[in-house]
């Protein structure tokens, strides 16, 4: 039995979407072989889709002091804390691929403090979790600790922005009952 993309809101047909959104979905499908359900779910509200993915791309696709794998570590750790099934599975797949490590996503999702990561990455995730769960407790000491691990002000901003953005994503995925695509489960687990 085929599961719905998201249970609580209608999923628009790709051929009925605005041209720019349809073009993006088809490009993603061509590159990955499938359309991730987040695209189909959020296409229900085209203006919000555009804003969401513009900010996503600005945070996740740029060069900077954080590697793309480290950005995905933030997503997986905070999404796990927020109990977001979709984001843990989907971004876990991306993390496995970007880190070239089939075990890292599971380790981070279960308990990043015991994962095979560097002290710098642990400090990054400690701060990301604080932003995600108890941002009201952020203090100057957090910035001092991050600086001692070599993070610049822009890096700290990126850690915070990724954590905050995916808090929105986690909540929308849970509200819509978004289902991870089956393809995500095995991605990055086996050598090509």
Residues covered by each model-derived region:
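Hydrophobic alpha-helical segments
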Residues: 1-192
